[in-house]
């Protein structure tokens, strides 16, 4: 089994804090998610997360006008410059202070950062697509200017259209006008008059007017004019100044303005308020277009795309991200992450969906291809502890602390069955047999295991034997046995389908945390509180092997820990374990920043995956800095809310002594942990439910350069020469797979004529068949050439069917991917056909009617040319009768072709 899994995507969290950005074409949205950046494709409905990560949560992001360079800055001022198309980190830089504002110039030559009350102008590194000479010129950032005239933090920066001037808005109640370079006759100007901090300032399209918005809901229009009442003929240049010509107010009662954005081309002003309402206004007349409530908490950021059609909103307290099309008044994107930490997850049998459950009582179904949440269930009234799919994947089962087990229909998206115990219990674990007819659950209140029938919903049995709370349950994949683990330091194997209930106890040295069945049902893995992993034979009920994973899983030190990271007791156990699809590896995670992958055959650690390096989360650093230790305790644990300048930021809405449940807990150093892991059914990826969100690690090599069987003669140039000049399609395809460049493979693949596909596949080497099969399956899901891809699949199955059957264990993953792609295509075609049945019937009916009309007109033309009113072949029908049969749709001149 391959172990080179790489981080590929982050789900479960769509927005944390900071600003949002639209791409220059307006089709992509960049959102800061913790210490990473997620890109949402709003046209194709897909998302991906850039592979880099910061050491702290991201505070500001900026994008060049060309859309090729992304600058992201964390809370400490550490910046990363990234090439967006290549997804490669280019440069690391430190601004040595927290950055409060960031903006790139429209020309792409400069960018400005706000460092508290200081403003710095920097040169943007040149790239081949931005430099006029087309040369690669890359150097560290070069500072152009520094301005220090504000008296409080700068909150917003806006450029003029010609990139010569820029506006800054600050908490010191003023906005200021600056020039990038020294301009003749220009001096920096202060725009003062607001009673609270200025949220933003913008130029109009003609740059004759400046609009400023303050926190108290005031909108001022500024113009470069003389004093009111002064004679225009007597006005000198010294008399002209930026003055307020109009004042407007939002009138949102006690709500304050948290964010605002302006679109100069359409004169649209949008403002987000602290009560979750946003308003859209047309300037300069301040005509309200509409207002809408989109959140229960304050809106933290709003931005407008280049065309002015879409508005993007971010609300950090609930983790909401929305894109609103104001003209049609509809949502383009509406996503929200879990309010609390995720407890469990499960892959659907086809691998296309991932279900996550959390302490907020919500169940979310995520699409693995798009990365979006497609449905959310909210019927549970307390935290959800476990989730399982039925074998076919149409039914989902969840257990909750509210004392219920619920069954969900994922076709109609409804709860069709609820299972409860005679007494009120808090269920902590659950298992479903492969047939989907039996559900078992254990609780922390009772030491019994409850068994229900899915068809009737009745409680069938209660299994007694454990002397402590049941912590884990698992059915054998073949459906014959049930294994349970408890805090009484035993695991039991139950034969629940026999006439007599028997259980085989397995004695362990510590409390059982989790149990996993191997896919062949011959072995179980048990994780205990002492950090050990034990492997037991199901048939003989004997331990086959064991692993001490305390040193592997331990790592990371919390702010208040007095012991080193290696000696912290809370991180020395695996809370969740899962077998790989082929049963050769075991994936384990716990209350630490590591996920461990073990080999079951050799009992060695194969690889450790670091969940997060975010220092905003406790438990991610190995050593603590003694300089951060004060007399009152570690600085990270001190409450600094009382020192905030804004009143609403000084309010502490959390209960005294509470450690969870506060909406702002994401900013109060939560602890890193992995509550659930799962392998995808095809074994090409695994996911982990962590504090950062739903992390997906995959073997996808579409972005990475991974050559296979390479030599000096194989280059992209030689491959294209073989393809275009020699027309040797087989050789060109093999060379492309050796280089393993996605663009080259696609070019060669699409250049092969469909008539030559059987000949190329017949001579294709067996060593590349699995790679070609996986590539064709991926093309089937993405490419519009449906028949072309199906011809490739048919040829591969026909020509290499014997080899695929003999090596089924090696290509099992590829065959599953192909089956999934073909099944998805079939469903899409069936859906398209079902939706257009009546349209096809109508078109066929129109064709038949047109054919009958043409036949009638032909007969009439023959009669007209012969001059007879009645013909033998017409069945005694006269010309007048034929004309009346046409119901007057055409005149006689049209019949005989005169018109």
From Swiss-Prot:
The keyword RNA-binding does not apply. It comes from the Eukaryota. GO terms for cellular component: cytoplasm; Pwp2p-containing subcomplex of 90S preribosome; small-subunit processome. WD repeats lie at residues 9-52, 53-92, 94-132, 149-188, 193-232, 252-291, 294-334, 337-376, 379-418, 422-464, 465-504, 507-546, 569-608, 669-709. Residues 889-899 have a biased composition (Acidic residues). GO terms for biological process: endonucleolytic cleavage in 5'-ETS of tricistronic rRNA transcript (SSU-rRNA, 5.8S rRNA, LSU-rRNA); endonucleolytic cleavage in ITS1 to separate SSU-rRNA from 5.8S rRNA and LSU-rRNA from tricistronic rRNA transcript (SSU-rRNA, 5.8S rRNA, LSU-rRNA); endonucleolytic cleavage to generate mature 5'-end of SSU-rRNA from (SSU-rRNA, 5.8S rRNA, LSU-rRNA); establishment of cell polarity; maturation of SSU-rRNA from tricistronic rRNA transcript (SSU-rRNA, 5.8S rRNA, LSU-rRNA); ribosomal small subunit assembly; septum digestion after cytokinesis. CDD domains: WD40 (cd00200). Residues 639-668, 866-899 are annotated as: Disordered. Residues 647-668 have a biased composition (Basic and acidic residues). Keywords: Repeat, WD repeat. Belongs to the WD repeat PWP2 family. This is Periodic tryptophan protein 2 homolog. It comes from Neurospora crassa (strain ATCC 24698 / 74-OR23-1A / CBS 708.71 / DSM 1257 / FGSC 987). The lineage of its organism: Eukaryota, Fungi, Dikarya, Ascomycota, Pezizomycotina.
